[in-house]
Every structure is written in C-alpha cells, then in structure tokens.
C-alpha cells in the first residue's frame, strides 16, 4: 500500500467547524481539499463508511478499497472536488498537490481505524453541543435526524446499552432535538470519552479554543507539517463556505438563547445519559 504521507484527516460532527478548519488549512497553494467522501447521497460509495463503527477493515474490504482510492486521489466526484480546480480534471492530476486535506463528518467512529490502517494523522474537532445542534437544526439535513445506520450495527447497539443503559433502537418518541443530541453523543462522547482515542498524530481540539486563538492553529500546523497561508491573520475570522446565512457568525447580530428551557432540559437529559463531561451543561 502506498504511503499517504502528504495527508491529514479532519473529522467531527456536522456543523462543528470541520469545513472552517479544512478550508483554512487548504487555502495554501497546492493544498487539495477532499470534501466529505462519506456523504451518503452525493457520492456513489459514501454509504459504505457513513456512521459506521470500525476498529479495522478486515470485515469491510469495500470500505477499505473505497478509502484507499479516496486517499490516492482516484475518486472523480464533483462533491468531493467542490473546492478544487476541476477544469480539464486538474484535480486528479498527480504530482500537483503538496498536501491533501480530507474532511469527514460521518466517520468519527472509524477515525481511529483510518489512522491506524492508513497511517494518516487525524484531527477530531469538537464544538459545544448546543451550538452544534442549533446549527444542525437550522440546516435540517434529513440524514442528521436519521439514526438508522447506528441502529443496524448490533455491536454498537449493545455497546450503548451496556455503557449507558440506553436503547438507540427505541427513539420513535424522541423529538428532533433529542435525536440530534443522541447523534452528537455517539459521534463525540464514544470515541473521545469512552474509548479515549489519542496518539501523537491523533488530536482532539475544541472549535471554540481554535477560533479564539490563532496561535493554536499555527501550533497545529507545526505539529502536522502544514504551512499556513501568509495572510492568515486577515482571513482567520472569516466564516466557512458552509456557514448558514442566518448564522450570527455572518449576521454579526448579538447571540440570543438558542433553545427554550424545556428544549435545553431535553438536551441536558441526553447528555447526562451519555455521561458526557466534554462541555458543561447549560444551567436552567
């Protein structure tokens, strides 16, 4: 297998800063961003890897081969290449990219396997659940509320029931916000707090910390042999291309309460159920 030594993987929940981080890194000349190869509907084979728990790929050869092609820059797909120069298929020309930045939003449960199997550094970016869920609920992508991929994995169902006393197959009576909270917990609490995935080339970083301190971004680049653009300071605060137009990041309006007390209570209940201490709970 070829060495993927020009690569970095960015994982995180949708609307948690993955696009902003990946785009900020990929602004550098000849850095190529591979955008969401795990998209279930915009790619032909993204369903092989979205919302899947894998410790390795011995029972998932199709997923392994798909990822191998992605990392080798051999998947010709407009969604994945949306941030690339696609004229004359330049995005597939070998030798041009100095770095590949691969951004995922549905592979948190297999990020460690990708790191081990392909030897690619991983940055798992997390954002507080309230802002993440509010942003997800604003864009209302149908797949965000669909927990069926998780529910079909009996080993994952058993793990969640054993560790948290919760049956993810029984969520029909849950509200949309509760389902988004369950997704956030599965994608972040399980790999970070339960499995405690870590390593010298596997980093967990908070979106809030990164946005507030440009020096943290520069340190991240140093640690992973990335080169920030010269005018980084002038673009660092810019929103990503995926920021919702009604977001206060764009409108610059004063931030208001995201949810009612009743809604906060339901989110807090799920967070408590999953024993999460990644962020403090909203006091009511």
Regions found by a protein language model. Give the residues of each.
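Hydrophobic/aromatic beta-strand patches that form the interior of the parallel beta-sheet core
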Residues: 8, 32, 121-124, 203-205
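Long, charge-dense
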Residues: 142-165
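PAPS/PAP-binding and catalytic site of the sulfotransferase fold
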Residues: 17-31, 114-117, 136-137, 204-229
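Glycine-rich phosphate-binding loop used to anchor ATP phosphates in small-molecule kinases
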Residues: 81-110
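PAPS-dependent sulfotransferases, especially Golgi type II membrane carbohydrate sulfotransferases
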Residues: 1-9, 160-181, 185-204, 210-284
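PAPS-dependent sulfotransferase catalytic core
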Residues: 1-86, 138
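Short His-Asn-centered micro-motif
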Residues: 11-13, 101-105, 126-127, 207-208
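Conserved phosphate-donor/acceptor-positioning beta-strand/loop module used by diverse small-molecule
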Residues: 103-104, 117-137
